[in-house]
Every structure is written in structure tokens, then in C-alpha cells.
Amino acid sequence: MGNAPLRPILITGGGRRIGLALAHHFLNLRHPVIVSYRTEYPSIEGLRKAGAVCIQADFSTDEGILAFAEKVKSTTAGLRAVLHNASAWQAEKTGTSLSETLSAMLQIHVNAPYLLNHALQDLLRGHGHAAGDIIHFTDYVVERGSDKHIAYAASKAALDNMTRSFARKLAPEVKVNAIAPAMILFNENDDAEYRQQALNKSLMKIAPGEKEVIDLVDYLLTSCYVTGRTFAVDGGRPLR
């Protein structure tokens, strides 16, 4: 008998930055990948050409989230992992609706993972002990808070807590962990002054790039024991 086909890894928000890097990493390993995307960046076509299944999704409504889940179910009978990378970064600003800001942050960071984890759990289960994974991408601000991004920080804190609840619910078949990054890589338009200020906030004084996160994801996927934990990738910021 031949080996069973590899189950795809689902990455939400796979069109940019860390999500895009993770998608290419697994594709380079010849592992099937499904990505969600909101905006048709040129990178999405590159992922298609590399072999990824790319599904446009609107996570701003529960209906959009559940419709995406149905598309995933119609694409594959099983999943190796779900990496919840889709995110938005919205600040409280004068003249904007505070309730709308909070609702938007909760929708993308809490409702989407919550509904997708429930909707897709059967695709992750049934493959053996610790054979499935869910990884939530939270944020360093969960630990320290943020005076300019209160709703964002609160929504990521809810996602962090949800990690432990889903770990309890889905063990031992599925491991559920979180990664809390800070300043992994800069944007192209970040000026030199901003970059230096950001680097000074950590003990390690670098922006390590996507590989630091990719290596941690690889570790979590290969572990048969680690679940319900949050892994800080912040260069020692809390110690400053």
C-alpha cells in the first residue's frame, strides 16, 4: 500500500508577510497548502503558480467566515493544520466609532478563529494522536496592553485565552498553541528613525525575519506533546 496523501495546511491571511512566507515554506517542502486572502495581491497569483489553493474570503461577517469553511470542506477531506494568521490593526482615532473599531477587531481575531475551529475540527480529527494542529497568531501586546490599540490588544488577548480552551477541547488528537510575535520584520516604507526606535525596544536589537516564526511553527507541528501554550517571539521586550 502507498503512503496516504498529505493533508493540506490551511493558512488564513496568506497573501502577505508571515502568512505568505509560511505558505511558500510548506510549498517548497511539497506540502499542499490552502490559503485565504481578502485582497488579490500579485503574491496570490504566485502562490497559485506554486501549487497553492487560494480561496478569497470575507471574514468581516460570520456568514463570510462560514462560507469560507464550506469552500475548504469542498476542497479537502482532511487538514494537517490550521494557522490563524489573518489579522487587522486598527487604532482608536478621534472621529471614528469606538464600537465599530472593537467589533471589527473582535470579528477578525476572535469570531473568525472561533467559528473556523468549530467548523473545521472534523477535518483535523480522526488521523491519530497529535496528528492535527491549530496555531493562533496573537501579539506581544497581549502581555503589556496598548494605549493606542486597545481594541486590537483586547481581541488578541481573547484569542490567546481561546488557545487554551480549544487545546482542552480537541486533545489528544489536535494540538492547539499560540505564537505571540513582536517586530518580526519591517515594512518597506518604515524609515530609519522608526526602525531604530523599534529595535531599541528589544534586548536582541534585530528584526529577525520570517524564518524565526517558520522555525517555531515547524517545531510545533512536529511535537507530539506541546499543547495549550503561548510562545513569545519578541526579542526579550518584557525585560527592557
Where are these regions (language model features)?
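Catalytic loop of short-chain dehydrogenase/reductase
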Residues: 125-158, 163-171, 183
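Conserved glycine-rich cofactor-binding loop
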Residues: 15-17
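Short, small/polar-rich loop/turn modules that mediate ligand/substrate recognition or access, typified
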Residues: 173-175, 227-228
